[in-house]
Amino acid sequence: MTKRALISVSDKAGIVDFAQELKKLGWDIISTGGTKTALDTAGIKTIAIDDITGFPEMMDGRVKTLHPNIHGGLLARRDLDTHLKAAQENGIELIDLVVVNLYPFKETILRPDVTYAQAVENIDIGGPSMLRSAAKNHASVTVVVDPSDYERVLAELTEIGETTYETRQALAAKVFRHTAAYDALIAEYFTAQVGETKPEKLTLTYDLKQEMRYGENPQQAADFYQKALPTDYSIASAKQLNGKELSFNNIRDADAAIRIIRDFKERPTVVALKHMNPCGIGQADTIEKAWDYAYEADSVSIFGGIVVLNREVDKATAEKMHPIFLEIIIAPSYSDEALAILTNKKKNLRILQLPFEGQAASEIEAEYTGVVGGMLVQNQDVIEEKADAWEVVTERQPSDDEKEALEFAWRAIKYVKSNGILIANNHMTLGVGPGQTNRVASVRIAIEQAKDRLEGAALASDAFFPFADNIEEIAAAGIKAIIQPGGSVRDQESIDAANKHGIAMIFTGVRHFRH
């Protein structure tokens, strides 16, 4: 009996060559619409789908393959006489191979000018139905959704006359992943269209971006996936200009770095980061000077760190960065001279180019945190804060210079692991105390880092001070300006201690925990 293949593809790459090889092997080919036209034009004889169904394609192509003569030919079990008898009695011929890929829904909704009606018209119905029918009956039917599998299928058909069960099962698994992701994307689009923020079912679809050597540690397997609808301002979308492949830890650190610099848009700024914590942030009138400040902030911790700059890297800045061992540099652009300097004898230095225009859109994405047996979903910690809404709770008002330092420190503290303390002046961080289990320990670490540079400095705390002992430590170091959320039942004790030492203290009313 002659084997039959049904081919209906939107992505026609390689399909003519594939069909020609099938014909050489003696297969009949059933086809539809544009695919049939392409194959006929190439001189490949095909059978029209309506010759199988007895019905013409109708309703602008919405109805063409949803017919028992198609799905019966796909779903009939070859090992059951009752199925084969039913097919014979109803004039249904068996279909042994299905090659289908789907309407380009993703590509359609990514177009900036797409209309709702256009999106709806690009939801494939018949394609997924054929794929699922064939995949369900993979014991007998080969199903191909990815052109990269053409070669594998042809090789087996040529060598042994059929595909192996292992191949059919693997291809069926790929189909079910593909149709699930396709439907998830449609669900995501419709959920956004109706403004639903707490769907009872959460379906996310991601594409494999990079197979990784290992995860956070060598004993952990890992891979990197990118959202099916890519975010422009993201590490997954960055263009790598130089260096080794990004590691798991590189990606996490780089993501943290580009989040931080989103909050420093107005002036040239450089952020240095290590293990998800900023170790130096500098801002100035030029990117070169901002680098100077970021490096000066902590010239020890920056070794082996990640640096992100929010302006083009110029020659002068590159010359200063080149001698320092860095894992990654990220910037919106690089001058030709700067790139030549940075790559000279630095083949392993990872240099990424990232378009900063997409920052605002990246801020509205939800954050997903995996826990054993579940997942937490929250908005990013992005909130517009205005200094004139803050409250000075002490007798002494901060000076103008202190106000600038307090505002700078408050922007930066948001990205320090809790319990987090950060000391800064108006243009650079001076000391960072991250991730301690009690706040006074974080205060001591930050002060120790900044101890020789505390003149005119301000201190920020990501959450309230639970006891006045923190204020006593800060006062003993000579710091005269503090910014914190407030909200402790013992706030008055902290205020009294600040007043006793002549410290100006601001309550923002906004907490910035970071776990």
Swiss-Prot record:
Q: Which InterPro entries match?
A: AICAR_Tfase_dup_dom_sf, Cytidine_deaminase-like, MGS-like_dom, MGS-like_dom_sf, PurH-like
- UniProt keyword terms in alphabetical order: Hydrolase, Multifunctional enzyme, Purine biosynthesis, Transferase
Q: Name one Pfam family in it.
A: MGS
Q: GO: which molecular function terms?
A: IMP cyclohydrolase activity; phosphoribosylaminoimidazolecarboxamide formyltransferase activity
What residue stretches are annotated with the MGS-like domain?
Answer: 1-145
UniProt EC number = 2.1.2.3, 3.5.4.10
Q: Name one GO cellular component term.
A: cytosol
Quote the pathway field: Purine metabolism; IMP biosynthesis via de novo pathway; 5-formamido-1-(5-phospho-D-ribosyl)imidazole-4-carboxamide from 5-amino-1-(5-phospho-D-ribosyl)imidazole-4-carboxamide (10-formyl THF route): step 1/1; Purine metabolism; IMP biosynthesis via de novo pathway; IMP from 5-formamido-1-(5-phospho-D-ribosyl)imidazole-4-carboxamide: step 1/1
Q: Which reaction does it catalyse?
A: (6R)-10-formyltetrahydrofolate + 5-amino-1-(5-phospho-beta-D-ribosyl)imidazole-4-carboxamide = 5-formamido-1-(5-phospho-D-ribosyl)imidazole-4-carboxamide + (6S)-5,6,7,8-tetrahydrofolate; IMP + H2O = 5-formamido-1-(5-phospho-D-ribosyl)imidazole-4-carboxamide
| GO process terms (BP) | 'de novo' IMP biosynthetic process
Protein family (similarity comment)? Belongs to the PurH family.
Note the HAMAP family from the entry: PurH (MF_00139)
About its domains, the entry says: The IMP cyclohydrolase activity resides in the N-terminal region.
State what protein this is by name.
Bifunctional purine biosynthesis protein PurH
Q: Which species does this protein come from?
A: Streptococcus uberis (strain ATCC BAA-854 / 0140J)
